[in-house]
């Protein structure tokens, strides 16, 4: 049985125009938990998708400031991970987790 912690680390795959462009370089983009570390992300991707990970780069996108009926609020921060796979490896993100 796969470790349930891995499903908590990887929230969802990112399917955008930019993420399909980086797939040419054997990379895949995921939304990950805000407190997830690079080793945790690497272990989760390797366990869930049965692939070998070469590198993990992370990005924290700060939440935007929004106003609703004069009240100022802020969206949540989002952490993204760009996972570089070893040569010959691939992940089909359209199938889901």
Curated annotation (Swiss-Prot):
GO cellular component, one term: ribosome
HAMAP family: Ribosomal_uL23_B (MF_01369_B)
Organism expressing this protein natively: Bartonella henselae (strain ATCC 49882 / DSM 28221 / CCUG 30454 / Houston 1)
Domain of life the protein comes from: Bacteria
Keyword annotations of the record: Ribonucleoprotein, Ribosomal protein, RNA-binding, rRNA-binding
GO terms of molecular function: rRNA binding; structural constituent of ribosome
Record-level GO BP terms: translation
Function noted in UniProt: One of the early assembly proteins it binds 23S rRNA. One of the proteins that surrounds the polypeptide exit tunnel on the outside of the ribosome. Forms the main docking site for trigger factor binding to the ribosome.
Database matches in Pfam families: Ribosomal_L23 (PF00276)
Subunit structure: Part of the 50S ribosomal subunit. Contacts protein L29, and trigger factor when it is bound to the ribosome.
Family label: Belongs to the universal ribosomal protein uL23 family.
UniProt keyword RNA-binding, yes or no: yes
Name of the protein described by the UniProt record: Large ribosomal subunit protein uL23
Record InterPro entries: Nucleotide-bd_a/b_plait_sf (IPR012677), Ribosomal_uL23-like (IPR013025), Ribosomal_uL23/eL15/eS24_sf (IPR012678)
